[in-house]
């Protein structure tokens, strides 16, 4: 049904927005947490523990459960979905970036510190350039995952195509379910191609 297919476009675009904004917010949150969780950049053992705790807590809770929690906080809608994606993704992105920070060339950092550079300058000149490829690659890969995860967040009221899919299933409108699933499948395949192409360029 071409008419119904057009109605699916709006929720599908909302799903992409949820995944994209959630991933963008993840980068903002995960980057400082990764520096706390990396042994060679954290301030002390307490801040290292806090950083690691945040990363583990984020990964321990499923995206749908985060969705339920944020629907309770913000009410049904895409805002809950964005925060659910963000809180789930912080652990994934932060862990990989923290590991990359721990594996940087310490000689570069020591050389910059020897010039009397501030901590912020060491971070900006000595550490960030070494981990940027990991940040770019991991962010794009996580965005690809988030496209899929945001497709089901509507089942708990957190916005996107999942709300429409849930309603169609509940009312046994199987033709509409088929149209939605085909649309979701197409977006997932497209995001996979985009993710793979970007990661190839980075590496």
Task: Please provide the spans of the model-predicted regions.
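Periplasmic/extracellular loop-to-transmembrane helix junction in inner-membrane transport proteins
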Residues: 1-22
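Membrane-embedded alpha-helices of multi-pass transport/permease systems
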Residues: 28-33, 65, 80-83, 87-109, ...
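Generic hydrophobic transmembrane alpha-helix motif, especially the helices
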Residues: 55-86
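Glycine-rich helix-loop "coupling/hinge" segments at transmembrane-helix boundaries
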Residues: 72, 147-184, 203
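Short helix-to-coil transition segments within interhelical loops
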Residues: 104-121, 125-131, 158
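Transmembrane alpha-helices
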Residues: 119-153, 175-187, 191, 195
């Amino acid at each position: 049904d071409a008419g119904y297919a057009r109605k699916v476009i709006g929720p599908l675009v909302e799903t992409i927005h949820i995944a994209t904004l959630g991933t963008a917010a993840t980068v903002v949150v995960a980057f400082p947490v990764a520096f706390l969780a990396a042994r060679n950049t954290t301030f002390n053992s307490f801040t290292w523990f806090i950083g690691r705790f945040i990363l583990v807590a984020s990964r321990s809770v499923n995206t749908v459960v985060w969705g339920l929690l944020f629907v309770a906080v913000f009410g049904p809608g895409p805002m809950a979905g964005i925060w659910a994606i963000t809180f789930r993704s912080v652990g994934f992105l932060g862990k990989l970036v923290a590991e990359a920070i721990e594996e940087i060339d310490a000689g570069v950092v020591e050389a910059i510190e020897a010039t009397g550079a501030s901590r912020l300058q060491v971070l900006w000149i000595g550490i960030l350039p070494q981990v940027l490829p990991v940040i770019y690659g991991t962010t794009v890969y996580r965005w690809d995952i988030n496209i899929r995860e945001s497709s089901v967040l509507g089942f708990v009221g957190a916005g996107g195509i999942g709300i429409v899919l849930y309603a169609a299933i509940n009312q046994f409108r199987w033709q509409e379910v088929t149209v939605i699933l085909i649309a979701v499948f197409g977006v997932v395949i497209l995001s996979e191609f985009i993710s793979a192409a970007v990661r190839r360029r980075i590496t």
